[in-house]
Amino acid sequence: MNPAIDLNCDMGESYGAWRMGNDEAVLQFVTSANIACGFHGGDPSTMRQTVAAALAHGVALGAHPSLPDLAGFGRRAMQITPQEAYDLVVYQVGALAGVAASQGARLHHVKAHGALYNMAAKDAALARAICQAVRDVDSDLVLYGLAGSALIDAARAIGLRAAQEVFADRTYQADGQLTPRSQPDAMITDLDQAIAQVLGMVRDGSVRTPDGQTVALQADTLCIHGDQPDALVFARGIRLALERNGIAIQAA
């Protein structure tokens, strides 16, 4: 059986007059959209427009909840309790679910954004709170989380379906965590390097760290960041490479 992968992209992250990403163009290459819910980006009109665009392209709808940090784009860590994490996720997923329902659609998945995602990947209590929030809103939702992380463990523990996420444009550390963006080797900007990393993760179940170590991981869904300068080039090139290698592309 040939391997399969979901291609997801964070989008709907514009806010008012401030514009982010190239959503409409990227949508033709992905199978899942992680849509901002207002706390790091995504005003109500942007949420509505992004849901409509995703539906028009047959792309699965996902909520992309964040810490309450518009100024920092949700990328700054905050000290929050598990209860606060639960409440933040319920509030934001509920908001996007309402937008989807107004257009006759339902959400497919939830993927935390930025610092909330990274914190919960390591913090079991936060991971449990986020997964419980998702399950309490809709037990049919899929939890997208960093491959091999506390989020995946927490989802499985409560019977929530989980999709293990890998990244095309980020490097990995020996413990399977993403290299922090503050480090110079965190981002992959060369398309050929990104494609080689993607094929290794999808076909071989492993990734090479910048210092040459090999880390095992499972790849169910691949993130393509829509806010990078070459997002469209990456999305097109990665999808073409996957198809040429006989890898099916479908929502997780």
Swiss-Prot record:
Gene Ontology BP annotations: carbohydrate metabolic process
Single Gene Ontology MF annotation: ATP binding
Domain of life: Bacteria
InterPro entries: Glyco_hydro/deAcase_b/a-brl, LamB/YcsF/PxpA-like
Sorted UniProt keywords: ATP-binding, Hydrolase, Nucleotide-binding
Any single Pfam family the record assigns to this protein: LamB_YcsF
Coiled coil feature spans: none
Gene3D superfamilies: Glycoside hydrolase/deacetylase (3.20.20.370)
EC number per UniProt: 3.5.2.9
Catalysed reactions, as listed in the record: 5-oxo-L-proline + ATP + 2 H2O = L-glutamate + ADP + phosphate + H(+)
Function: Catalyzes the cleavage of 5-oxoproline to form L-glutamate coupled to the hydrolysis of ATP to ADP and inorganic phosphate.
Subunit: Forms a complex composed of PxpA, PxpB and PxpC.
Protein family according to the UniProt entry: Belongs to the LamB/PxpA family.
Name of protein: 5-oxoprolinase subunit A
